[in-house]
Every structure is written in structure tokens, then in C-alpha cells.
Amino acid sequence: MHTSIYANRSTSFSPSAGNDTQNTFGRVSTGMISEVVYREDQPLMTQLLLLPLLQQLGQQSRWQLWLTPKQKLSREWVQSAGLPLAKVMQISQIAPCHTVDSMIRALRTGNYSVVIGWLSEELTEDEHFRLVEAAEEGNAIGLIMRPVNPDSLGRGHLSGLKIHSNLYH
């Protein structure tokens, strides 16, 4: 499993940041975007990584939004995973071409502690920038879930944990 976390990137150079200058310099945003590249044949690893975070976020008064392409969340799984059933919303059958825009709209609202979306392709720089901006604006976490084919793992370095953060660089 490979994760990339992009946190607290400054938006002070963006064209739309003019009105947010005070926020950019006056406080540290807690909004962030994280990408989890995982093997579908190893769901336990993904659950071990994400469930503690989702359980902690479930203690907030805000919702958790799951934008899933195919599968529907099982009520039994949500409850057995320790997630608050009353705070979990799901939109299933969402077309992959609409996932990023849907995540951006949801993150901006501030109604969700976390927005989880599945993508089959890597984000473009523009998509990533817009997601980070939206997460910071809504003080939320966006999780990009990207399944990888186990056969393609031999071609690149995707088996390690990689965390990008300005706290360490």
C-alpha cells in the first residue's frame, strides 16, 4: 500500500486567494488531501490504516461522505467498524468523471469531516490544487482511494509509505 499526504499547502499565490490572505497567514489550516493507493486483494491493510482515522473523525458533529463508484456500504460493516451510522452518507454509482468535482463541492461546504472518493487515475496538478483549496476552505479531509492492479506493482515503487508534508520538509 502506498499513501501520499499533501497537507497545509499555502494558497497565497492562487488567483482566488486574494480574499483569503488573512486566513492564509493568520492561521494554519487543518484541511488536507490524502491519496491512498491500495491493493484490492488486501482490504485488511487499507482498513487497518484508515479505520482509526475515520473512527476519530466520527466523533465530530459533521458527516462523513463516501463517494463510491460501484459498491454500496453495508450497514453491518459500518457499525462493526465502529463508525457512526447516523453520520455516514454515501453516494454510490457516481461516475468517475464526476468524483473530483463532487469532492470539491462537498469539501467546500464544511459539512463533512471527511470526503472519500475512489479514482482509477492519478490526479492532475490542477485537480489536486482545487481539492487542497476546497479542503482548507471547509476545514475537512479528502481521501482519494486509488486501487492498483497487483500485477503492476513490480514496475514501480508503490509498496512503501510515502507522506508528503511541509512539516518535515
Curated annotation (Swiss-Prot):
Please list the GO biological process terms of this entry.
division septum assembly; DNA repair; negative regulation of cell division; SOS response
Keyword annotations for this protein? Cell cycle, Cell division, DNA damage, Septation, SOS response
This entry's comment on induction and repression of expression is: By DNA damage, as part of the SOS response.
Q: What does this protein do?
A: Component of the SOS system and an inhibitor of cell division. Accumulation of SulA causes rapid cessation of cell division and the appearance of long, non-septate filaments. In the presence of GTP, binds a polymerization-competent form of FtsZ in a 1:1 ratio, thus inhibiting FtsZ polymerization and therefore preventing it from participating in the assembly of the Z ring. This mechanism prevents the premature segregation of damaged DNA to daughter cells during cell division.
Which stretches does the entry tag as region FtsZ binding? 106-112
Q: Which family does it belong to?
A: Belongs to the SulA family.
Please give the residue ranges the record annotates as the region Lon protease binding.
Answer: 162-169
- Subunit structure comment from the entry: Interacts with FtsZ.
Q: Which gene encodes it?
A: sulA
What's the superkingdom here? Bacteria
Q: What is the lineage of its organism?
A: Bacteria, Pseudomonadati, Pseudomonadota, Gammaproteobacteria, Enterobacterales
The protein's name is Cell division inhibitor SulA
Gene source species:
Enterobacter sp. (strain 638)
Q: Where is this site: Essential for degradation by Lon protease?
A: H169
